[in-house]
């Protein structure tokens, strides 16, 4: 079983965009947080399925670190 970190971003027009940093281009959307997470799981599964079909390596979150930077408002 694989685990991936996801980032949810609330959109001004409503809903949530989900990004999977370890899987480039794996982005999805949901109207609610719950739906966004559900859609992320589906997107990750389809992404990995496509990688397997093409014989490509499956990236993991191993060695991935998260850090929040605060910068001045210039």
Predicted regions and their residues:
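A short, exposed loop/beta-hairpin motif centered on an aromatic-Gly-Thr core
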Residues: 24-33
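Intrinsically disordered, low-complexity regions
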Residues: 15-16, 31, 56, 64
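Short, charged, surface-exposed hinge/linker loops at domain edges
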Residues: 1-4, 38-74
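Short aromatic-glycine-(Arg/Gly/Cys) micro-motifs in beta-strand/loop hairpins
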Residues: 8-23
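Hydrophobic residues in alpha-helical membrane-spanning segments
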Residues: 22-25, 60
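Short, flexible helix/strand-to-coil boundary loops that buttress conserved ligand/catalytic motifs
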Residues: 20, 30, 48
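Extended aliphatic helical segments
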Residues: 18-20, 27, 71-74
């Amino acid at each position: 079983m694989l685990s991936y970190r996801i980032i949810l971003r609330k959109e001004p027009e409503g809903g949530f965009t989900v990004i999977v940093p370890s899987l480039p281009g794996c982005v999805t959307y949901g109207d609610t947080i719950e739906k966004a997470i559900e859609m992320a799981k589906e997107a990750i599964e389809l992404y990995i399925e496509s990688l397997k079909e093409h014989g490509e390596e499956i990236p993991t979150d191993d060695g991935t670190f998260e850090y929040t930077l605060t910068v001045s408002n210039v």
